[in-house]
Amino acid sequence: MKGCLATMDKELWIKRANDSLVKHFYEQQSDIEQREGFESKLTFGTAGIRGKFGLGEGRLNKFTIEKLALGLARYLNAQTNNPTIVIHYDIRHLSTEFAQIIANVLANHQIIVYLPDTYKTTPELSFAVRNLNTTAGIMITASHNPKDYNGIKVYSSDGAQLSTDASELVSRYIEEVGDPLQIDIPISKQNTSYIKPFPKSVTDDYMKHIQNMIGYIPKSDLQVVFTSLHGTSVPIVPELLKSLNFNQFNLVEAQCKPDPNFSSVQSANPEDHRAFDQAVELANKSHADLLISTDPDADRLGIAERDAHGHITYFNGNQIGALLLNYRIQQTSQLRHRLMIQSIVSSELTKSLARYNNVEYKEVLTGFKFIAQEIRQLDDHQNMIFAFEESYGFLSEPFVRDKDAVQIVPLIIKYASELKLYGKTLKDELEQIYQTVGRHEDTLFSHTLEGLEGKKKIESIMTHFRSNPPQEIQGLKVKAIEDYLTSEVYQLDKDTTSQIDSPKSNVIRVLFDEGFIALRPSGTEPKIKLYVSLKCPDFDDVAQKINAMIFS
């Protein structure tokens, strides 16, 4: 009977294919991919919804977007009288169309919608929510995912992504909508009057906040190459740099044009060195010193440095975090009660640097919304000077409540330009940090374990660490094990257990005197990540052996 219903359901969807906006994507998919759309449902989680285009409730299409929008409209009207919202969207396939669909549904429920006429960055959306004082915000993006993906992120009134509790409530409202093929959205002039143009003044204010944060960029002969990886950071980043009287940059022209197919990049992810290939070519031709890339929605940023011999040094997210924290510590020496916030899987290096400079630090779960929650709870006397995640997400000043590559680009250029005046590089500065607080090193192993066997393997690894805590790993003596699923920390040397003040998450962190390792399964994919952050000789060898021991 279930198979018959699935077949009927598929037939109904195929009949509506011409109206779905995704017929072309569906027709390009394999039989398995097509079937997945009918055998699963998109779920609204803590990071919103992200998925492939296609037919069925397990894919993004006109009807599933209408269902999401209707659930969100009911949620907003239940939360407050006369709700308002601002929508931004990136350069991906159907981002513009999805934005208009959502705006129409919300307007149909008497919700005022601010909708721009062009693509915008994610940090601009976070700022706009705060600047316009709206009830919520929506960002339509799938960050650096492949071209056949898109997604919807929802923001609360403080410009941060929805809390876990709010996300669960929105999810329930969406589910209560029922069959997306049965939704009827009447559109009238009276309703569309609720859709307002996005004020240019908001973008101007955002630029002013960054200009005030940077002040000026000192004159040096620093040369920069920049790529937006076909995303949203052009034109805003070049305009911002020019407004700060910095013109010594070249754009990777082929990659600085919006392109939903990401035609000129193997990967639109700044974590991936391949994303820099064309930037390296241009840097060699122009003898540039600094290479910067942003991901398609401009919330994350990667950097590399070219020396006089043409050698390229790529910095990982933790190293960029350490450099930026070091610079912010220098910039804010006059402030008291300084605070740095980072995720629990980010480096020991930045914590050591904070301690050395008498800067308080806090650790939060992975996900920038948890950093935003800490910012929201700051006392009046606390000064947040920097926040970051090892996955290349950084925030210098909290007028934005999400990762913000746009404000970081001129900050890193200013830092590099100052160093250039003294004949130094970012690589030199990182080496100085190591000499000051020790050579803490970091690496990440990501394992994809498909199918039922893979799921069992992931569960087995996590269960083993919970039920049989190791005394030592590769000669490193275990001090404590933090289990964020039970919110408990077990101190091995004292044989005591205490509570962790944190929301629950399926993460285990094993602490040593030398640093930590952390295990974190994905909530949506058949993946598990191992983070290694240690100060020890032969780091690479030790990290590889730890990985082999756990996943053999």
From Swiss-Prot:
An MF annotation (GO) of this entry: phosphoglucomutase activity
Note on cofactor: Binds 1 Mg(2+) ion per subunit.
A Gene Ontology BP annotation from the UniProt entry: enterobacterial common antigen biosynthetic process
Catalytic activity from the UniProt record: alpha-D-glucose 1-phosphate = alpha-D-glucose 6-phosphate
Pfam families linked: PGM_PMM_I, PGM_PMM_II, PGM_PMM_III, PGM_PMM_IV
Pathway terms, separated by semicolons: Glycolipid metabolism; diglucosyl-diacylglycerol biosynthesis
Class of enzymatic activity (EC top level): isomerase
Lineage: superkingdom: Bacteria
Keywords per UniProt: Carbohydrate metabolism, Glucose metabolism, Isomerase, Magnesium, Metal-binding, Phosphoprotein
SUPFAM superfamilies assigned to the protein according to its UniProt record, in alphabetical order: Phosphoglucomutase, C-terminal domain, Phosphoglucomutase, first 3 domains
UniProt-annotated catalytic positions: S143
Family matches, as InterPro entries: A-D-PHexomutase_a/b/a-I (IPR005844), A-D-PHexomutase_a/b/a-I/II/III (IPR016055), A-D-PHexomutase_a/b/a-II (IPR005845), A-D-PHexomutase_a/b/a-III (IPR005846), A-D-PHexomutase_C (IPR005843), A-D-PHexomutase_C_sf (IPR036900), A-D-PHexomutase_CS (IPR016066), Alpha-D-phosphohexomutase_SF (IPR005841)
Binding positions for Mg(2+) per the UniProt entry: S143, D295, D297, D299
Needed cofactors: Mg(2+)
Enzyme Commission numbers on file: 5.4.2.2
Family indicated by similarity: Belongs to the phosphohexose mutase family.
Entry-linked PANTHER family: PHOSPHOGLUCOMUTASE 2B-RELATED, PHOSPHOMANNOMUTASE 45A
Function: Catalyzes the interconversion between glucose-6-phosphate and alpha-glucose-1-phosphate. This is the first step in the biosynthesis of diglucosyl-diacylglycerol (Glc2-DAG), i.e. the predominant glycolipid found in the S.aureus membrane, which is also used as a membrane anchor for lipoteichoic acid (LTA).
Name recorded for this polypeptide: Phosphoglucomutase
Organism: Staphylococcus aureus (strain MRSA252)
The organism's taxonomic lineage, starting at the top: Bacteria, Bacillati, Bacillota, Bacilli, Bacillales
Gene: pgcA
